[in-house]
Amino acid sequence: MEKMNWTPESGDNFTAIYKNYILRVERMGPQKWWWAVYKDNEDLCYDNPFTRNAEYGKKLAEQCVRDDESGS
């Protein structure tokens, strides 16, 4: 899988687009980050509870895409 190009948005939020996936990481509070992955505009996976930082949220979102592509 190619490297994800994460784009910063307003605040401490990030988005990456890969094929037909949209990956998002958003800051929800001090040391609270939420991540989600959408495929074809439908929920694929998301985090609950929150992760500890943006980088970890990005890794979890990318793992979701890898798992989906491999059929895991």
How would you describe each model-predicted region?
Residues 1-9, 34, 38-72:
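Mixed-charge, Lys/Arg-enriched low-complexity segments
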Residues 1-34:
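Short N-terminal "domain-start" leader segments
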